[in-house]
Curated annotation (Swiss-Prot):
Protein's name according to its UniProt entry: Gene product 168
Any single biological process term in GO: symbiont-mediated suppression of host DNA replication
Keywords: Coiled coil, Host-virus interaction, Inhibition of host DNA replication by virus, Modulation of host cell cycle by virus
Function recorded in the entry: Targets the host DNA sliding clamp and inhibits host DNA replication.
Coiled coil: 19-73
Length: 74
């Protein structure tokens, strides 16, 4: 992603110097936005997966503690 960001900024400064047409800059900006959206979606998915795993672990701990309590009460 960093490479693409650098490429975008380099192209943008090339455009500001009058060497690039507006349509190609617009296409490059759209491509950059799409990459950012993909990265955001992946980060959300990774976070959701991590939270699911932590919840499963918490449930396992609670269930094992309940079993210990049941054994003590008997």
């Amino acid at each position: 992603m960093l490479f693409f960001k650098e490429k975008f900024y380099n192209e943008l400064s090339y455009y500001r110097g009058g060497h690039k047409d507006l349509e190609s800059m617009f296409e490059l900006a759209l491509e950059y936005i799409e990459k950012l959206e993909e990265e955001d979606e992946q980060q959300v998915t990774d976070y959701e997966n991590a939270m699911e795993e932590e919840l499963r672990d918490a449930v396992d701990v609670i269930e094992s503690q309940l079993e210990i309590i049941k054994d003590i009460v008997r």
